[in-house]
Each structure stands twice: as structure tokens, then as C-alpha cells.
A protein has these predicted regions:
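Membrane-proximal intracellular helices of multi-pass ion channels
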Residues: 1-489
Length: 489
């Protein structure tokens, strides 16, 4: 047991024990898919989940039963647990895809699971319509788990983490510039956020079921939408339903899912002024509206689609892009290059921090623009003191430095990912688009990946899986593990 001793002041034992708890939770999330497979008489698929549950429970029990003397967790343990959780969840979550009769190779299965958990929504399946109901549900469940965050769910259900260690985990996984506790206790904050998340899922599922979708498809698409994931039960995504009702309803809920859940909480309490006065929410609204209007104008001139259909499809696709949902209401391969460039910009920017979306986040964009404005002002008036304010709060120089570091890591990761894909034979533009799609957790395909990501070689799938992980955890929780300082005393 010496391997689990507190080596170099890093408490490995408590990390392993918590990983065991988390695997038991993951096994519980697999159970509905096994039940659905049984209900649809998909015996082979049902057994694939039973095998997966048994293996996951066994591994989880080993970790959970590990004796731990010291339950203290610091920042390093928080970062280590956060990163390991997403990787371990992906390794065990891929088991149903491997054991299924339509089994995927390991690189494809890991990619599919990482894509689901990070709510990227990119798929290696050539046809999802050939998959069992259990597998289709499991894909959407991975979105549901990852949308609000694996660690955040753990904070809501494991009382022992309602300490300083819980705050470390919260800060390691939650996205954005600052992390707001809307309740005094971190566990209550997690429970409140998950309550809002589940409520939005239920409302959307009911609305989709009231339309052309059956209950099963409504459940799958409801979870995928609020998580801004993008997995669908149809090969042609939402376009296959040919329903403006579905597109309009999902556009509204994708937009809502792109707003900070802390802000949604305040609005649910009747504080509508907080939404109106919020700088980030206003930028989000105007960027989305402006981009939708610009793309609609371009496609109206360049395509043969009637305006009546463009005003439904383009807002859907625009909100899908900026919220990193990755759903398709139209074939973007037919778009004008100007529209594609706007879509890439939206993918990179993302929506609001504290939501289920990917990308750089509008919060950082607001800070970058305001800081640039201040720098221009200082050139004219060197002695002027004009601090950067976002939502009425003065942001420190340290916060600005963190945003600059984030931009550098984002650009570096995009460059390395694009280079790696281009070396595997993909043309440069497709390599950049695909890397951007995975790094921003968008999942949208174009050109080589227009239909799916199946044709990318195994090496490329591992690269893209890593990009999805660092994009979801916003670099620091993963990159810090690669530094010598993290492992030293």
C-alpha cells in the first residue's frame, strides 16, 4: 500500500477513493440504457451494458474500499482528481460501445465517449440509426453527465466534499473568469445548479414530445440540447425531422443553455434586472442576433433557399454554433465561405461562462475588448487610471494575465492539433476546422468530417480526444499536470 502513501505531499489515496465512488456513480448511469435495451428486446445490447456495469462496479469498489487515513485535499489533489475523472469516465464509459454487437474499435469508442462527456457531439459512427436504443440513450446520457460537470454532480451527492476540498474541485472544473457560489455551502450550490439543469431538461423533453418526436427521441434530444452536446438519434441530425416546430423550440433552449446557470438561477428568483444589466449576457444576445442576420443575408443572396426557411434554419444553426451544440438543421457544406468563416468565429468564441457550452467564452472576449480599449486610451493619456470592469466589477491585472495565458494555450493547442491532423493526410483547412471544432467542444463537421469523424485515422482520434478534454477543462486542470512543479514538493 506504499504506492498510496502521501507521496511528495500529494494525497493519492483520497484521489483513488473518490475515483472509486465516481465509477460507482457512472455504473448507475449505465443502468437505464440496459433497461431500455431489455424493453426493446435488444438482448445483445443489454448484455453489453451488463458486462460494462459489472466491470465498472468492480473497479469502483476496489477504489472505494481503499482505506484512507487522511481525507484532506488541496489544490493539487483537486486538479489531479478532475483530470483523472474525465479520462477514467471515458475509459469505462467506452465499454458499452466496445461490447455492443456493432462494436467500435478502442480509439473510436474512447473518442465517442470523450465526445459525449465533454459535450462535443462529434461521432465516429457511420450510421447512428443502425445502433440499439440502449447505445443511443447512453450517448445522450454521457452528454447529460458531462453537461453540468461530473465533479459538480459529485459535490451535490457526496457530503464529505462539503469542505475546502469541495471548493478546490469546483474551481478546477467550472469554466470562466470567476466562479460564483450562489449558495453559502458548495454542496448546496451544486444541488441548485443541478436542479435548474434537470428542470430545463424535463421542460424541453415535454415540449419535444408534444411535437413530431416520440418519447425516446425527445428524451435523447432533450439531454443533448440542454448539455449543448449535439448527439442525435438521426444520421442527418435535426434536419431529418423536417419540423420548424422542433427547430424553433430547440433554438430557444440552446440559447438558454448558453447563459450562465448562476444568472438563470437569479432570474428564476425574479431578479430580471440582473439579466438586463449583465454585460456578458448582452454581448451574447447581440453577437448571436448579429451573426444570424449576417449569415441569413449571405445565404439569401448566394443560395436558392426561400427566405421563409432561412429565417428558421439560420438562427438554429447560429445558436448551435455559438453554444457549441453542433446540431445540424441544414448542410453547412453548401454554405458560402463567408458564412463558414462566421461559423468558425462563433465556434471559437462560445457562449457564457458558467453554462454548458465550450469555446473561449464571451466573458473573456468582453475582458479582451475592454482591456484593448483601455490600452488605446493609455497611449493617449499615460497617467490615466481606467480599470477594466465587467458586470460592474473591477477585474484585477492578474485576471487579465490569466486570460492572456488562456488565449496563448488555446492558440497553441489549435496549432498543434491542426498540424497533427494535417500530417495524417487531411487538408489544412479541414484540419484547422476539425481541431477548432473539438477544442471548442462544438463537434460540427465540415468537408472531410462533414458526415462524421469515422474516416480519421486512430492517431488523429486520440489527438482530437485530447483536444476535447483540454477544451472542456479549459487547459489549466490538464496542462498543470504536465509541469514539474506539480509533482515536486
Amino acid at each position: 500500500m506504499m504506492i498510496f502513501a502521501k507521496n511528495n505531499n500529494l494525497n493519492f489515496a483520497v484521489v483513488v477513493k473518490l475515483l472509486g465512488m465516481l465509477l460507482l456513480i457512472e455504473a448507475a448511469f449505465m443502468l437505464p440504457s440496459a433497461i431500455v435495451s431489455f424493453a426493446y428486446h435488444e438482448t445483445a445490447a443489454m448484455w453489453s451494458f451488463i458486462y460494462s456495469i459489472a466491470i465498472t462496479v468492480g473497479a469502483g469498489a476496489l477504489g472505494f474500499l481503499l482505506p484512507v487515513r487522511n481525507h484532506d485535499m488541496g489544490r493539487r489533489e483537486g486538479f489531479l482528481l478532475t483530470s483523472l475523472t474525465w479520462v477514467v469516465f471515458s475509459f469505462f464509459g467506452m465499454l458499452p460501445f466496445i461490447f455492443d454487437p456493432c462494436g467500435l474499435p478502442v480509439p473510436d469508442a474512447f473518442f465517442e465517449t470523450m465526445s459525449g462527456l465533454t459535450t462535443t457531439g462529434a461521432s465516429t459512427m457511420e450510421s447512428v440509426e443502425n445502433q440499439s436504443h440502449g447505445i443511443l440513450l447512453w450517448r445522450s446520457v454521457t452528454h447529460f453527465i458531462g453537461g453540468m460537470g461530473i465533479i459538480l454532480f459529485t459535490l451535490a451527492v457526496i457530503p464529505m466534499l462539503n469542505k475546502q476540498s469541495g471548493l478546490q474541485l469546483f474551481n478546477a472544473e467550472v469554466t470562466g473568469l470567476t466562479h460564483e457560489k450562489i449558495r453559502p455551502r458548495i454542496s448546496n450550490t451544486a444541488k441548485t445548479l443541478w436542479t435548474i439543469y434537470i428542470a430545463l431538461n424535463i421542460i424541453l423533453i415535454i415540449l419535444l414530445w408534444a411535437g413530431p418526436m416520440n418519447l425516446f427521441e425527445a428524451i435523447c434530444h432533450g439531454m443533448s440540447t440542454i448539455a449543448t452536446g449535439g448527439f442525435s438519434t438521426r444520421d442527418s441530425s435535426i434536419a431529418d425531422f423536417n419540423s420548424n416546430y422542433i427547430k424553433i423550440v430547440m433554438t430557444i433552449f440552446m440559447f438558454i443553455a448558453g447563459i450562465s446557470f448562476s444568472l438563470i438561477y437569479r432570474v428564476s428568483k425574479g431578479d430580471f434586472k440582473s439579466l438586463i444589466k449583465n454585460d456578458v449576457a448582452r454581448w451574447y444576445f447581440f453577437i448571436a442576433i448579429g451573426a444570424a442576420a449576417a449569415i441569413t443575408a449571405i445565404e439569401y443572396v448566394q443560395s436558392d433557399e426561400p427566405l421563409s426557411q432561412l429565417v428558421v434554419d439560420i438562427p438554429f444553426q447560429t445558436i448551435s454554433d455559438i453554444t457549441s451544440s453542433g446540431f445540424n438543421a441544414t448542410d453547412i457544406n453548401l454554405w458560402h465561405h463567408g458564412s463558414i468563416m462566421i461559423a468558425i468565429a462563433l465556434m471559437m468564441i462560445g457562449a457564457c461562462a458558467g453554462s454548458t457550452t465550450g469555446g473561449i467564452k464571451i466573458d473573456r472576449l468582453v475582458l479582451i475588448v475592454k482591456n484593448l480599449k483601455n490600452e488605446m486610451y493609455r497611449i493617449l493619456f499615460p497617467n490615466a487610471i481606467n480599470p477594466v470592469r465587467v458586470n460592474g466589477k473591477v477585474l484585477s491585472n492578474d485576471m487579465t494575465a490569466k486570460v492572456c495565458a488562456f488565449r496563448l494555450l488555446f492558440a497553441l493547442s489549435l496549432f498543434v492539433g491542426s498540424l497533427a491532423l494535417s500530417l495524417s493526410g487531411i487538408n489544412l483547412f479541414d484540419a484547422i476546422f476539425t481541431s477548432m471544432s473539438c477544442l471548442s467542444n462544438n463537434g460540427l463537421g465540415y468537408g472531410f468530417t462533414g458526415q462524421n469523424f469515422a474516416d480519421i485515422n486512430p492517431y488523429g482520434k486520440w489527438v482530437l480526444s485530447f483536444l476535447m478534454l483540454v477544451g472542456r477543462l479549459e487547459f489549466s486542470a490538464v496542462m498543470i499536470l504536465l509541469t514539474k512543479a506539480f509533482w515536486s514538493k
